Amino acid sequence: MTPEHLPTEQYEAQLAEKVVRLQSMMAPFSDLVPEVFRSPVSHYRMRAEFRIWHDGDDLYHIIFDQQTKSRIRVDSFPAASELINQLMTAMIAGVRNNPVLRHKLFQIDYLTTLSNQAVVSLLYHKKLDDEWRQEAEALRDALRAQNLNVHLIGRATKTKIALDQDYIDERLPVAGKEMIYRQVENSFTQPNAAMNIQMLEWALDVTKGSKGDLLELYCGNGNFSLALAHNFDRVLATEIAKPSVAAAQYNIAANHIDNVQIIRMAAEEFTQAMNGVREFNRLQGIDLKSYQCETIFVDPPRSGLDSETEKMVQAYPRILYISCNPETLCKNLETLSQTHKVERLALFDQFPYTHHMECGVLLTAK
């Protein structure tokens, strides 16, 4: 695979290899055949980051080869959304011959939605001033004149200039209902929107008919908790990043959901609060004991669950675990399988043509 060529003819084979690999990894814990969810074979990534290379008068996007660390010029990127590809061309054309926008520009980040909105961030090794803002506003207006619904942001050390706004609103069709998700620049969002829809629908399916409340750790912008709110009496969710919490609060209102409570704290802190080890001012007015959480949802970082959180989740009858790293999932299952068994197993091809796998398991108490 090269950045400008996807081996789409190999899609089925690479997916089949992942299924076999996941089954092998999960064999000590389950003999289930994974439910398999396919990605679009191209234009599936809704975000991308590129370094910018200055070559005489020329200017272009590059990425670095992971093995050799050599530079690879990238003029098109079929893994990314069609809107990102349009913007890549338009941004280079708009910046290449503009000394103010070009000088000391070293990276461009793109974030797009299925609803065809975009935030583009330009990163600089220099101070950004009013002249930069004026030129950036002219570029933004020129892009919009090309029917590109784009917001521009300039970033430098300790500086962030958002010309209009630093977010876009995604609209996802999930189980016959449109979900609105505010996505903030430089915050985590699911990279493959088509796969995200399938993950949300799978999570809804495995939790249908649920009793009681849902507890979610690492909720981000509320991606899963808002979609799952329909299946539970109440949802209590934690997230540490301020921009994500603010986006989640907006998303609760935008989707007219009244049974979700977001708390800004780390999973480890919440574990301490639940166990009565510490009290937190942030929890004033929230009666944790009133929640009857029969199900806990975790979507941890690549490092998986820490040992304290492992112990904490074992107290719940049902554990829904979305993993972006099956190796750490299996490490966690060494502990979780002592008290729970795997009821459902899914493979989500979030990153086609790469070694990476995303998977989901539903665990129920033995």
Curated annotation (Swiss-Prot):
Q: Which GO terms describe its biological process?
A: tRNA methylation
- Gene Ontology, cellular component aspect: cytosol
Uppermost EC category: transferase
Q: What is its EC number?
A: 2.1.1.-, 2.1.1.35
Parts of the chain that traverse the membrane: none
Active-site feature positions: C324, E358
Q: Which UniProt keywords apply?
A: Methyltransferase, S-adenosyl-L-methionine, Transferase, tRNA processing
Family, as annotated: Belongs to the class I-like SAM-binding methyltransferase superfamily. RNA M5U methyltransferase family. TrmA subfamily.
NCBIfam families for this protein:
trmA_only (TIGR02143)
- Return the protein name: tRNA/tmRNA (uracil-C(5))-methyltransferase
Organism whose genome encodes this protein? Shigella dysenteriae serotype 1 (strain Sd197)
